[in-house]
Structure formats: C-alpha cells, structure tokens
Amino acid sequence: MRTLWQHCHVATMADGRYSAIEDAAIVTSAGLIEWIGPRAELAPVEADRTVDLGGAWVTPGLIDCHTHAVFGGNRSGEFEQRLQGVSYAEIAAQGGGIASTVRATRAASEDELFASARQRVQALMRDGVTTLEVKSGYGLDLANERKMLRVARRLADELPLTVRATCLAAHALPPEYAGRADDYIAHICDEMLPALAGEGLVDAVDAFCEHLAFSPAQVERLFIKARELGLPVKLHAEQLSSLHGSSLAARYQALSADHLEFMTEEDAVAMANAGTVAVLLPGAFYFLRETQLPPMDALRRHGVKIALASDLNPGTSPGLSLRLMLNMGCTCFRMTPEEALAGVTVHAATALGLGDSHGSLQVGKVADFVAWQIERPADLAYWLGGDLPKRVVRMGHEISN
C-alpha cells in the first residue's frame, strides 16, 4: 500500500542533525520511504491512503540500543537498602546484586520471562520506541542464556518492533565458576557461543570489561571467537575504571562501546578511527549517583558518534522511558537536544548495525517514524515524563494513534 503522510514538519536526523523540512510530505510503500521532502515539491502521486498529521513534528522511530529488558525477579529491596547506607559489597555478601537476578532468571520459565519483559518493552514502545536491543547475561549457562535469547526473538515476533539480540554471557562470573574466570570464558567460546549462534539466536556479542568482571585479555578471547563466527561485537567499558576496553573494542571494529565514564582521549581517538559508537547510559549514572562524567569534549573533538540508551536493567537503571534518557543526557552529560535525539535515532541505529536501514528519514530506509504533537524537536528532551500525544508508524503502518 502506498500512503501519503502530509501536513507535518520532519526532523530527518540525516548526518546526525535535525536536517528539518517544514511543511513536509512523506510517501511510504512496501514498508519503506519512497519519497520525502517539502510538500510543494511533491509531484502528483497515486496514494491508496492520505494521512493528515495535523502539523506534527515527525522524527525517526526511537531506537533503544542498550537494554537488559529480559530478567527475573525484582531488586527494589536493594534500592531501599542502598538508600539506608548498606554498601553494594554488603548486599552482595547477603546474596544480592546480580547474583540474585541470575537466580531469579534461572528459576523463571521462558513464558514467565516473556510476560514480564513484554510489559517493560511495551512501556518503552509507549515512548515512541520502534527498535531496541535486548541482551542476555542473567542466565550465565547455556540453557538459561538460550532461554533469554529465545524471549528476545519472541518479543520481535509478537510485538510491532524490531529487536536485536545480543549475547552477554560474559556479564558476570556464575557461581559454579567462582574463581575460574578463564575457564568460564573458555566455556563461552567453546560451547555456549557456537551453540547459540548456530541456533540463530545471536545478532551480536557483548562483554563486561571491568576489574569486577572480565579482563581485557579475557574479553579479547571472546572477541576472537565472535569474529570466527562472523558476529559483530560490543562492549561494556570504562564504567567504573579505565582498562582501555573501549580501545580494545575499537581494534575489533566493535559496533559500540558503552558507559565510558572513565575513557581517555586515546580511547576516543581509537573509537573515532574504527567508527565505533559511544553509547552513553545516563540512567545508570543517575541511579548510582555517579560523579565521573563521560569525556564529552573528547568525543566531540574526535568525531565519535554518540548514542543514548536506557540500559534498562533491575540493578542499576530500572528505566522504562527512553525520552527521560534524552533529558538526562542533556542535563547530566550536557548534550544538546539535537545530539540527544541523534543518540536515540541515527547513531543508535549504527550502534546496532542497522545504519543502512534505520535511524533517519531518507528514501530507501524503513518507514519507522513518530509524529509528535510538539512545538519543536527539542521538546522531546525538555518534557519530563508524561505521554506526549503522538502517532507511531512502523514499516509504513500506523500502530498507535
């Protein structure tokens, strides 16, 4: 079906800028953008349907490029404990922290994990999200990592949403491998990753590179295996300390390196040269009350593409609003509203390996967009909370009004 969408203004986000078109029109067909530009320049078109968008501002569908949306259990009790002065180490000694999420995720059935993840993902969708990434990493063994990745595939099958599934088996050390990190990495490389990739459950491979998780040398072994399997890589890096994990990620042409509060100028240069996207996660920064800011000036100076994401997870960023992350990116990290919107559209698409098809409104790209009843694009980062009036279109078909 060919649809003409008109009476709107468009922030195309081409090249990471608003690249605004006022009094615009969009023609979609077969799920793609067939034409976009000033309405006055549109030649007569035979459309099956014409939609008046009422003067709305149209942006690409929002992309949440870093989530841990599939998990069992709830850690709000730990949140209360931390606010009462209990340290993370004390909580962990009591069996809390990520270990509690691993236990709950292992105990949950696939259907239970799907039901809870569906609710969280639908909350993100209400903010205009049309594409997101879902990581595993709370199973930490083959059966349970498979279970999590199967849920990610089910979310894509049952919701009007594009989902990229990332294997994060190297998220933490499972209890059965206590004190044997090298053995666990070998297990991932030799057994888990080949099996999961062979089942078509993995779009990318991620790891957590930190003193409390895995070393750069251990991560590199995983990256070598991912390369053998033809899988792109990503990395949690420089969140709590500087191990130059982001430079390691760049050496393997990673799609992204994420967090990055402690990255150096040298890391920024490496990422820029490799085209690796910097994914900033202000929700975790806020929730943990951190003070070390990502080096925004270095990222800008060297031309590193900057994305924003929710980091939705039960322990450090239980955030169900990507629009809130736009505001946090501006207020916490001093991003401009234009940079923030690029961070959840065009640069987020690149961070998922979808830059050729998603993230900006251009001819030939997927017709995912949101028509917002706002005065200007900056309003998306300005308003805190609430459900802004909007119409969400995925692959040329309206999914909400």
UniProtKB/Swiss-Prot annotation:
It catalyses: 4-imidazolone-5-propanoate + H2O = N-formimidoyl-L-glutamate. N-formimidoyl-L-glutamate binds at Y138, N313, G315. Pathway: Amino-acid degradation; L-histidine degradation into L-glutamate; N-formimidoyl-L-glutamate from L-histidine: step 3/3. Binds 1 zinc or iron ion per subunit. 4-imidazolone-5-propanoate binds at R75, Y138, H171, Q239, T316. The keyword Nucleotide-binding does not apply. GO terms for biological process: L-histidine catabolic process to glutamate and formamide; L-histidine catabolic process to glutamate and formate. InterPro entries: Amidohydro-rel, HutI, Metal-dep_hydrolase_composite, Metal_Hydrolase. Fe(3+) binds at H66, H68, H236, D311. Keywords: Cytoplasm, Histidine metabolism, Hydrolase, Iron, Metal-binding, Zinc. One of its GO terms (molecular function) is imidazolonepropionase activity. One of its GO terms (cellular component) is cytoplasm. It is found in: Cytoplasm. Its EC number is 3.5.2.7. It is an enzyme of class 3 (hydrolase). Catalyzes the hydrolytic cleavage of the carbon-nitrogen bond in imidazolone-5-propanoate to yield N-formimidoyl-L-glutamate. It is the third step in the universal histidine degradation pathway. Belongs to the metallo-dependent hydrolases superfamily. HutI family. This is Imidazolonepropionase. It comes from Pseudomonas putida (strain ATCC 700007 / DSM 6899 / JCM 31910 / BCRC 17059 / LMG 24140 / F1).
